[in-house]
Amino acid sequence: MNRSSLVALPLALAVGALVAVSAQQTPPAPTSPAGAGSQQRAPAAPTGPVKRLPNGHVDLSGVWQGGGPVGDIKMGLAKGETLPIKPEWQKIMDARQSKDDPEANCLPTGVPRRDPYPWRILQTDTHTFLLFEGNIHSYRQIFMDGRKHPSDLDPTWYGHSVGRWEGDTLVVDTVGFNDLFWFDFIGTPHTEQLHTVERYTRTTLGTLVIETTIDDPGAYTRPFKITFTARLRPGEELMEYICNENNGFVHHITGPAKEF
């Protein structure tokens, strides 16, 4: 069954088939989720030397899968580390219901969450764009022209991002988030004090390691790091997927926020 025919399936199929693969930190060769690709096993990520742009920087462009938390952000913590969440926010998290997940209601995932659909990186000299197939076909723009964060930001789903290169790693600094999105299916929270620093390193032609430092003194006792791996999807293109056209099943989701 190809992707175009799967897009019309109910959200239940999408969620149920996806998380087992997408929530893993480093899926070896992920099976495409319903609504986002053929159910046949995806080809192995290509190997070989990393390509470069004419300006000498690493070429990060292409269609990728994964690279961030889906089911549980703790999957990205280092072995033995625990989430430094404040007790009052743990109570809020424990009370959350799956039906209230903004992502399940066709709203953006925010940062650093990924939905279980492909996404694309586009690079220019002045901007890097992240284009997302899932939900509302949203995008992030990362300013690469040396500007600073404005002092009067209105809170938004993806915040305000500025990028720079440290050797072969793209470093993305983001502030100005709203507090409306969840970090994952289980409702891990944040506040408008959230500040993220993402480090994108293309270790091979088909592998992109994304390390994110999360600093949110409103909800956590200290900054912490998560690491996830995205795999290149050679030959893939992003499809038009309008979540609002196919979201009738969300009204049947019940119970506490959890991994499906």
Which residues are covered by each model-predicted region?
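PEST-like low-complexity, intrinsically disordered acidic/proline/serine-rich tracts
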Residues: 2-260
